[in-house]
Amino acid sequence: MLCIQSTKTLTLNPLDPVERDFLSIYSIMYDGLMSINDDYLPETDLAEDYSVSPNGKTWTFKLKKDLKFSDGTDLKASDVVATANYILNKAKNNSGYYLNLKYFVSSISAEGDYTVVVKAERAYYGLLYAMTFPILPAHALEMNNPPGTGAYVCEAFHPGVALRLAPNPYWEQGVPQVTRIHVNIKPTAADVLSAYEYSGTDAIFTRSIASAQYKGGASSLALDYRTNQLECLLMNHSAFPLNLKSVREAIRCIVDVDKIARSYYNGMVERTDTPFISGTWMYDDSLSNYFRTDPVRAMSILEADGWLDVDEDGVLERLNDKGEYVELKMNLFVYEEPDDNVRLETANYIRDTLGAYGFKVTVQTMKFTDVQQALSVGNFHLCLASYAMDVCPDAGFLLMSSNTGNYCRYRSTEMTDLCKELRKQMTQPDYQRVLFQIQRQFAEDCPFICFFYRSGTVLTRRMYTTVRDVRESELLKGIDTFRTN
C-alpha cells in the first residue's frame, strides 16, 4: 500500500501530468523509445537499437517486435509517430509537459511497422534524452487512462481518494513480482506523513522537511531521491553592485551553502556547485577550489576592488564614477512554497551572514508571480529561486546570452559559444568534454550561485528496488522485477 499527495489530478494522462507523484505511477504503466539508466545515460527501451546518419540529423529507431499495449493491440511505429506529433502540436502553443521535444525534433515518420525516423533540429547527442516520453496507442492519445506497455495497468481510479494498479496481462516480461499496488491519495504532505505513521501504509513519497525525523527508524527504510529542482541564488548583472565580478565572487566565498543544506533543509538536498548533477559523468569535480567557503578571501577580493568601511558604520563603501561613496547594499527577493518557509529562513541567513562582512541586504518576501515579474524585467539584485531542469543535461537556457532562463542578464561570448558547441556533439565523451568546459567557465565568471538539487524521501517498510540513482519521476522503478529472499 502506497500513499501520495494529490489534489489536481482528475484524469490519468501520462502526456500531460499535473502533479509530480503521478509521474512515478505513470513510469510503471508506460515506456518510451529510450530510458535513462542508473549512470544517467540513455539506453534503449521500446527501441531495440538505433542508428544515426553521418550528418547527425537523421536518427533511425528500430522497435522491438511483438510488443503489445495493455489492451492487446500491437505496438507499431505509427503509435510512436502519433504520440510525438501530439506532443509537438501542443508545444506550438508552449503547452504540454514534454514540450521541450520541439527543440530536438523537426519531424518524425514511420517506415513500416517497426522503424521510426526522426529528423533532428541539430546534430546533437541530447536527442536521445528527449526520446524518453511515454508512448501511447495512436487511437488513445486523449483517452483517460490510456493503454500502455509498462508492467502495470490502472484498474480503478477515484480522484483525490485512491487508485489501484494490477499487472498488465501483455507485459513483455510476464507477471511482475509485486502483483497489486493500492495507492491512497491525500491532499497535503502532512496527511501523507500521518498515513505512514498511523494508517499502516507501506510506503510514501515526500519532499517534506519534516520527514527527516523518520530516517533511521527501526521500522522504516529511507530512500533519498533527487528532484529536478535546482535551487540557486540569482545575481543581477545589470544592477550595481552585482555587475561587478568582485562582489559576486565575494558573496560566493561568504555564503556557506553546506550550512544552508544542513541547518535549513535538514540535509534533504544533493549539493552541486554547477547546474549539473554531482556524482555523475556530467559533473566536473575538479573545480572545488572556486566554490570553497572563505570569508577571508572574500574580504581580500573586495578590498582589492576598492571596498572599504570609510565611515565605520559596518557597511562597505566604494567611490563611483562621480567620485561619490556608494554603499554595498542590495535587496534579496524570496518567494515561498506553500508547505514550508525554508527559503525565507535561508534568505535571512544570507542577509545576516553577508551583513557581518559589510553588506547591507534587505530581504523582501513576495508572491511567486511578483518575483516572476521582477526577474523578467530585471528589477532585482539577489533572488532565491529554483529552476526545473530538463531531463537532457543542457543548461544553455539559463547560461546563453539573452536566453529565456537567463534572468541574471549574464553576458559571456565564451559561454554562449560553448553552449552552442555542446549542441553539436554526437558522442557521450565529446558531450562530457564540452560540459566540463562550460562548468569551468561558470566557475570563473560566477554568474550566479548553485546551491543544490532538492531531494525527497521514499519512506518504506519493505525494500522494493535495487535502483542506484533514485529520481523523482521514477520512484517505483524496479518494483516490477524486485525479488525478495
Where are these regions (language model features)?
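Ligand-site clamp/hinge motif
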Residues: 168-214, 360-362
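Bilobed periplasmic-binding protein-like "clamshell/Venus-flytrap" ligand-binding domains
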Residues: 125-130, 307-336, 426-461
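Surface-exposed binding/hinge segments that line
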Residues: 51, 96-140, 156-158
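Aromatic- and charge-enriched surface segment that lines or borders ligand/interaction sites
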Residues: 48-93, 241
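Append "and occasionally in soluble cytosolic enzymes with long acidic Gly/Pro-rich linkers
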Residues: 243-351, 437
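N-terminal lobe/hinge region of extracytoplasmic solute-binding protein
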Residues: 3-54, 85, 147
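Gly/Pro-rich hinge or "lid" segments in bacterial periplasmic/extracellular proteins
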Residues: 37, 123-180, 185-191, 295-300
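Detector for C-terminal structural segments
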Residues: 254-285, 342-351, 375-485
